[in-house]
Structure formats: structure tokens, C-alpha cells
Design a protein with these regions (language model features):
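Short beta->alpha connector loops
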Residues: 15, 42-45, 112-116, 136-139, ...
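Extreme N-terminal starter segment of soluble prokaryotic enzymes
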Residues: 2-8
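Membrane-proximal helix-turn-helix segments that form the acceptor-binding/catalytic region
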Residues: 94-104, 142-161
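A short, histidine- and acid-enriched strand-loop-helix "catalytic/donor-clamping" loop
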Residues: 115-118, 127-144
Length: 180
């Protein structure tokens, strides 16, 4: 029997949204005898958690509901979460050693564009890096992607997009056929 491919998938949570639903549907359609999957969530929460197949190992950085207010009683937990995640982003070796227990992956996959840097900054240089882009990055409200920021996505081995418009945006910025 062939050795299972080890895959790490990163996403913020499984709270709601199209990307989260697409990811869970994708996981349900993978053959469990071919893949060993670790799904790393920043926040263990969401309506799609119950739909994750049993063969997927769900890991998380924080547990509980997303804190969307600045109520006084919520600030310490919110601050801890932000600082903890920032430390792990700045020092990814800590994440891979202590949360992922030194596991080596064949593939590291950003299920949404917001995890671009986390995957590209992985200490596991030999893994294939994939990203799934679900949004028109020229219109995102959370981040202003300059051409330079956009070009960082070409650090991935494979960029998967959900529309022709997004594909065209990347092709315009591609500097050679390999990037296209």
C-alpha cells in the first residue's frame, strides 16, 4: 500500500462562509486511505465543525467563540488570542514544534488567502505550498493588496482560484509562463 500524503490545511475557523463550506465539502470528497490531514484552525468554532470527516485531525490555537465586541470582560481573552497568534506567526518554528509536534508535511495548504504568509513562512521548505483564493483581492475590504503584495502569492507552488476574473488578475501580474 502506498504511503499516505501528509497534508496541513490552515483556515481561521469553520464559523460560516463560502470558503469554509467549500473546504468541508472538499474534505468529505477526499479518499481517506490516501491522505493524512491535519486541519489547523486559529479558533475552534463554527457550524461546519460537525461536518468535518472523522479521518481529519482537527487542531486549533484557541477555543471558544469569536469575540467581536470590546466589552471590558472580553478584552483579556481577546488580547491573549491576538498576541498568541501573532507570536506564532512571527516565530513559525514554535507552531511547528509545539502545536504540530514536529510533524513533516508533504503539502501545506492555505484554504483562504488570509493564510498566505503563514504557509509561505513555514519552516518546512520541502513541502508543496498551495493556496485557494475565493475573493477578488482587488476588492477586499480587509487588506489593500498592492501589486507587490499580490506578487507574494507567486511564492506558492499552486494557486487555485474560483473565478476567471481572479485568474485574469493573476495572469496580468505573472512575469513568465511558469507563474501563469
Amino acid at each position: 500500500m502506498a504511503k499516505k500524503k501528509k497534508i496541513l490545511i490552515r483556515i481561521g475557523s469553520l464559523r460560516h462562509g463560502g470558503a469554509e463550506k467549500v473546504l468541508v465539502t472538499f474534505l468529505k470528497n477526499l479518499p481517506k486511505d490516501k491522505y493524512e490531514i491535519d486541519l489547523l484552525l486559529n479558533l475552534y468554532s463554527g457550524k461546519y465543525l460537525a461536518e468535518v470527516p472523522d479521518f481529519v485531525n482537527v487542531l486549533y490555537l484557541n477555543k471558544g467563540e469569536m469575540i467581536t465586541t470590546n466589552r471590558l470582560q472580553d478584552i483579556p481573552v481577546k488580547a491573549f488570542r491576538v498576541i498568541y497568534q501573532k507570536v506564532l506567526k512571527i516565530f513559525p518554528a514554535l507552531l511547528y514544534q509545539y502545536i504540530l509536534k514536529g510533524k513533516k508535511y508533504d503539502v501545506e495548504f492555505a484554504a483562504i488567502h488570509g493564510f498566505r504568509d503563514e504557509i509561505l513562512d513555514s519552516p518546512q521548505k520541502s513541502s508543496k505550498k498551495l493556496i485557494w483564493i475565493h475573493n477578488d483581492l482587488k476588492k477586499t475590504e480587509f487588506h489593500n493588496y498592492t501589486d507587490e503584495e499580490f506578487r507574494k502569492f507567486f511564492g506558492f507552488d499552486k494557486i487555485m482560484v474560483i473565478s476567471e476574473k481572479i485568474q485574469q488578475d493573476f495572469e496580468v501580474l505573472a512575469k513568465n509562463e511558469e507563474e501563469k
